[in-house]
């Protein structure tokens, strides 16, 4: 959640931003292994602060799927979701076979090559894998919990099959993600919602969305979406 501190500052004091922490971080409760259970848990936590809608929801990367599932569960419970913002996430239900997956990796490699960051990206990925293995083997209790939760959440997202959301969605993409087939992403997300998919492009990398200067651009896009939703 600390990665969203910059975003919160850019949104300003008059626009609170609440982050929700995965269950199991304290070691006293089991971690979730299904996106549906994560969403139900977050809704329960959210309702301690705001029992009823209208709700303004958002998620970044893998968190977008959880926010999308939360929106569906809230609607099923008769609550209003005034705004749903999804940030730089491919749509669920794709479950690509191995060949398209290799094509996807090749497209990403080409982007980093053109952006002159290919070797940096490869080194970062290797370092991330190494750190996760290190956390599991020799890390302290808290570090091992984090690594275990990461693995559980990765499996949960692989297994997730989404339902339908009834309403509009604001979709914010990084410049990095636009090397992927825009039409495919747009069409697939559009199939999962009944309203309009409003897409905005932020001129930064995926990770840069919550860093400087990308966080400012992301906050501006979210702020504009909030104002539009409130005006309806």
Outline where the language-model segments fall.
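A hydrolase-biased, glycine/serine/histidine/acidic-enriched motif that marks catalytic-domain neighborhoods
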Residues: 1-232
């Amino acid at each position: 959640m600390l990665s969203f501190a910059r975003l919160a500052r850019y949104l300003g004091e008059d626009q609170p931003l609440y982050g929700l922490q995965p269950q199991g971080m304290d070691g006293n409760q089991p971690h979730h292994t299904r996106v549906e259970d994560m969403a139900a848990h977050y809704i329960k936590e959210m309702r301690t602060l705001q029992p009823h809608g209208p709700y303004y929801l958002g998620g970044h990367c893998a968190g977008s799927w959880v926010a999308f599932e939360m929106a569906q569960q809230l609607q099923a419970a008769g609550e209003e979701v005034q705004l749903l913002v999804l940030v730089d996430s491919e749509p669920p239900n794709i479950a690509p076979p191995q060949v398209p997956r290799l094509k996807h990796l090749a497209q990403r490699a080409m982007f980093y090559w053109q952006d002159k960051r290919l070797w940096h990206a490869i080194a970062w990925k290797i370092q991330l894998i190494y750190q996760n293995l290190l956390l599991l083997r020799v890390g302290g209790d808290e570090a091992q919990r984090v690594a275990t939760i990461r693995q559980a959440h990765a499996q949960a997202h692989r297994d997730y099959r989404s339902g339908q959301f009834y309403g509009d969605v604001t979709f914010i993409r990084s410049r990095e993600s636009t090397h992927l087939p825009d039409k495919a992403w747009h069409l697939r997300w559009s199939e999962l919602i009944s309203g309009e998919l409003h897409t905005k492009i932020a001129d930064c990398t995926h990770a840069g969305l919550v860093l400087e200067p990308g966080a400012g651009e992301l906050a501006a896009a979210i702020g504009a979406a909030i104002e539009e939703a409130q005006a309806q």
